[in-house]
């Protein structure tokens, strides 16, 4: 082989290494968006996908790209769960992955680059360009592990991803992956199941919970990103200070993007806002299910088990109804609602007529009806 031919061959290999690995990546599924007016609230709602079972990402971070142009979601329309982008302005859906069934573990839009998401496929962390569909392998998650991979989250500067894994039958680990160097380091190991791992968007802190599926002696924890200072986060150790005579169950926690506070559900008691020191205040009392805040923290979106969705004003606790009937057809649906990057939209999972994703443009709300 001549030097010129060899150089050409090596260049082709290099190009091939960055191209999407599977056949349906980049497929244009067209526009499936349909709109309706909620019969109770009068709010216009756009459902974005009609083919297959469609789901949003967990609400620990915005499901929108950094430029607010696309909403990232999953769908089973090809037979296995894959990731897609939906253009907010048009509703046009384009396929982002075509991985073998059961190999995708989670995805996280890059807050610093609008064209990039990070995903976990098998034990590899991939940087995927959602415009040209090229891929870069960031790193392979180092053993030992027996699974337990969860949705990655990004540090505020965009330089690191949290990685969660189950080391063995009794041990769980949180690690940090440097996305530029591909270097992984262990932050902490615990002898209990770890869940809801989230890097703070404002501070070098990682939040996590002792996951039991119910009450835990101490559910919420925070650790410095260098592994030091592991400590309980929100804690009320004196029963006299509990919001309820029953043991508290704190759940469905999420950082507030620009303030470094955290929203939490106090089960059957209400919605809490917790500061960086772990001190909480009750924003609104009631039996709510999930909560996420607008990036500036001024408003929250909350839902309940009856399939109703509200916009909540943080300062006053006033709320207004956005949507109803989210569990009318598919009872298993969890709304997992959250805001876009600018606070213009609310996105959520709905089972009103089928399992799909929907958005509400808050700038088009009818006259205020606060309660």
Give the label of every model feature segment.
Residues 19, 24, 72-78, 97, ...:
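Beta-strand C-termini and the immediately following turn/loop, strongest in propeller blades
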Residues 24-46, 173:
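Blade/loop signatures of beta-propeller domains
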Residues 46-52, 92-98, 134-144, 183-188, ...:
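A short beta-strand motif characteristic of beta-propeller blades
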Residues 61-70, 106-116, 120, 151-160, ...:
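Blade-terminus and WD-like Trp-Asp/Gly-His loop motifs, strongest in beta-propeller folds
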Residues 87-91, 129-133, 178-182, 224-228, ...:
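Short loop/turn segments that connect beta-strands within beta-propeller blades
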Residues 98-171, 182, 186-193:
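Asp-box/WD-like beta-propeller blade repeats and closely related beta-sheet repeat scaffolds
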Residues 239-240, 281-294, 317-341:
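Conserved blade-ending motifs and adjacent loop-strand segments that build the rim/top face
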Residues 333-371:
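Blade-level signature of beta-propeller repeat domains, shared across WD40, Kelch, NHL, RCC1
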């Amino acid at each position: 082989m001549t030097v010129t031919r060899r150089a050409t061959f090596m260049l082709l290999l290099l190009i091939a290494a960055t191209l999407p690995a599977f056949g349906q990546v980049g497929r244009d599924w067209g526009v499936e968006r349909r709109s309706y007016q909620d019969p109770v609230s009068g709010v216009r709602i756009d459902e974005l996908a009609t083919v297959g079972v469609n789901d949003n990402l967990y609400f620990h971070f915005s499901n929108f790209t950094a430029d607010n142009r696309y909403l990232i979601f999953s769908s089973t329309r090809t037979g296995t769960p894959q990731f897609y982008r939906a253009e907010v302005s048009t509703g046009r859906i384009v396929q982002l992955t075509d991985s073998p069934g059961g190999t995708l573990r989670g995805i996280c839009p890059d807050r610093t680059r609008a064209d990039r998401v990070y995903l976990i496929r098998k034990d590899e962390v991939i940087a995927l360009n959602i415009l040209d569909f090229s891929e870069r392998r960031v790193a392979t998650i180092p053993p030992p592990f027996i699974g337990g991979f969860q949705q990655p989250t990004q540090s505020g500067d965009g330089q690191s991803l949290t990685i969660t894994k189950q080391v063995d039958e009794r041990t769980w680990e949180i690690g940090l992956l440097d996305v530029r160097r591909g270097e992984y380091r262990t932050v902490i190991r615990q002898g209990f199941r770890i869940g809801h791992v989230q890097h703070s968007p404002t501070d070098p802190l990682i939040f996590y919970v002792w996951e039991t599926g119910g009450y835990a002696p101490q559910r919420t924890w925070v650790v410095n990103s260098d592994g030091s200072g592991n400590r309980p986060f929100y804690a009320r150790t004196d029963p006299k200070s509990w919001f309820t005579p029953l043991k508290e169950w704190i759940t469905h926690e999420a950082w507030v993007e620009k303030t470094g506070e955290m929203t939490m559900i106090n089960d059957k008691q209400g919605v809490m806002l917790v500061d960086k020191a772990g001190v909480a205040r009750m924003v609104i009392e009631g039996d709510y299910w999930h909560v996420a805040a607008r990036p500036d923290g001024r408003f929250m979106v909350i839902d309940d088990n009856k399939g109703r969705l509200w916009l909540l004003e943080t300062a006053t606790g006033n709320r207004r109804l956005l949507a109803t009937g989210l569990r009318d057809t598919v009872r298993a649906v969890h709304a997992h609602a959250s805001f876009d990057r600018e606070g213009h939209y609310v996105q959520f999972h709905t089972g009103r007529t089928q399992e799909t994703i929907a958005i509400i443009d808050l700038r088009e709300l009818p006259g205020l009806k606060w309660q």
